[in-house]
Swiss-Prot record:
GO terms for molecular function: NADH dehydrogenase (ubiquinone) activity. The gene is nad2. It comes from Dictyostelium discoideum. The keyword Electron transport applies. This is NADH-ubiquinone oxidoreductase chain 2. Its EC number is 7.1.1.2.
Length: 488
């Protein structure tokens, strides 16, 4: 009886992946009126995400499916919740923008592609077979390439999308080359088989090289320096909300895939070259992200460079010895980053806008927010200080607990360099705060702002509440995360 119940749950789960996709395609070609079609697509996509969340709650937290091709743990389940909630939030923001007539750059095809990419991401996080991982990553990547363009005819968008496609293709080729190298030497693509054979042939450099190539390909997809050039141009051409979607979802999935590889293969095979190589990339990324952000005037490029810096901090668990604890802190840091960035983008595109209906694009335009609404101005300052990681906010503490284990392990010089570089990004965040508070004189040619109403206010209030609560219950939140992902 229990076996039949589990099979029924599996059938429902995988049909929920595919049936809504078919329904959305049929809706997009059968309904003639544009507004009705878009609203139905939004509702069906949000309902599908809710159903998947319900199924995640019903099914077992740990399972092995499809002959070991998919394995789910408490950590993966927890991160899947985060991914689905973030996706629901972004889709709701797109829906609100369409209702209010804002320029959100969303089409019916884009909604279908967003859902298709979500399917690929959910599978890739559970993948325990290299070819399953590769195919699911490619589903996501193909959707992202098209979303980066999203029917935008601007030169910068086309150029960014083309760069994304080329670099993504190179990264996929590197990953596939690593998979081929591993299969040639082990005769298997399953993580467990690779681990057993790899430990028997501990001196076989080809298996280690194959895993290193897979990690390198994933790092390129993440946008870590010096493989970051495509990311800046791509994000600038996609629009603020789509940038938010691409930035957050890509980080969530890539980090979890790297954690899976680390916990299942890299740790046991003792591949030191990966740890040392990633340490160099982390330092280079922090330097590039910090220096690059200091000379940016556009909001979206500033967010892109900030994303590069945060990518480096999120993969610090690779260079530490206490991996389990560092993974917990990385997840906690990721949650703080998502909430802070969500509130920032909600303020910029959802609460205030120019007279002609456009979004704030230049950082210097932020000075007028203080003149028009001091409550929103204060909220924006709080979020910027929170993202900068200044004390006493929890984002400062989450950075500290990520970096401090390196001191315990004796990596003092590396820790000092990381601290110095993170201070650099704090300086630029504080420069933006200065623009809001001090440079508040209205200038000719700068539009005033009109307040809008809707879900954006709710999102901002919710984010500010999290910032306050996380200050008070920091230890409790980290303990809850440890319990959820079954790490003590």
């Amino acid at each position: 009886m229990m076996f039949l119940f589990e099979n029924s749950i599996n059938m429902i789960k995988y049909s929920i992946y595919l049936v809504p996709l078919i329904i959305m395609i049929l809706l997009s070609i059968s309904i003639k009126e544009d507004s009705n079609r878009m609203m139905l697509l939004f509702k069906s996509l949000k309902l599908t995400i809710i159903l998947i969340l319900v199924l995640l709650t019903i099914e077992e937290a740990i399972y092995v499916k499809l002959n070991g091709h998919l394995i789910k743990t408490e950590l993966i389940t927890f991160v899947e919740y985060i991914l689905l909630v973030v996706s629901y939030l972004i889709i709701s923001m797109f829906e609100e923008g369409v209702k209010e007539g804002r320029k959100t750059k969303i089409t019916e095809e884009a909604l279908i592609l967003m859902y298709s990419s979500l399917i690929g991401m959910l599978i890739s996080m559970e993948a325990h077979n290299l070819i399953t991982l590769f195919l699911s990553l490619e589903i996501t990547s193909i959707c992202f390439y098209i979303l980066a363009l999203n029917k935008n005819s601007r030169k910068v968008s086309i150029e960014g999308g083309l760069k994304y496609y080329i670099i993504g293709g190179i990264a996929s080729t590197i990953i596939l080359l690593g998979i081929v190298s591993i299969y040639k030497n082990t005769g298997s693509l399953m993580y467990t088989d690779i681990l057993v054979i790899g430990m028997e042939r501990i001196g076989n450099y080809q298996v280690q090289m194959g895993i290193a190539l897979i990690v390198l390909g994933l790092i390129i997809k993440l946008g870590v320096a010096p493989f970051h050039g495509w990311l800046i141009d791509t994000y600038e051409g996609t629009g603020m909300l789509m940038t938010f979607y691409l930035t957050i979802t890509q980080k969530i999935v890539t980090i979890i895939v790297l954690i899976n590889l680390y916990k299942n293969l890299i740790t046991y095979l003792n591949i030191e070259v990966i740890n040392k190589g990633l340490l160099v990339l982390i330092l280079v990324t922090l330097i590039v992200g910090t220096v690059g952000s200091l000379r940016q005037q556009k909001v979206i490029r500033f967010i892109a460079y900030s994303a590069i810096v945060n990518s480096a901090l999120l993969i610090l668990f690779f260079v530490g010895n206490n991996t389990e604890e560092l993974i917990i802190y990385s997840i906690y840091y990721l949650i703080n980053y998502i909430i802070g960035l969500a509130v920032l983008i909600n303020i910029i595109i959802g609460v205030v806008k120019t007279k002609n209906g456009g979004n704030i694009e230049i950082l210097s335009e932020l000075k007028n927010i203080w003149l028009n609404n001091k409550v929103i101005g204060i909220s924006l300052i709080i979020v910027l200080i929170y993202l900068a990681g200044l004390p006493p906010f929890t984002n400062f503490i989450s950075k500290i607990i990520l970096i401090l284990p390196l001191i315990v392990e004796g990596k003092i010089y590396i820790t000092m360099i990381i601290f110095f570089l993170t201070v650099g990004i704090m300086i630029y965040y504080m420069n933006v705060v200065k623009i809001i508070i001090i440079d508040k004189k209205q200038e000719v040619g700068v539009e005033t702002y009109k307040m809008t109403k809707g879900g954006s206010i709710t999102n901002i209030v919710g984010g500010i509440i999290w910032i306050i609560i996380s200050q008070i219950y920091l230890d409790e939140i980290i303990s809850i995360i440890k319990i959820i992902v079954a790490i003590n």
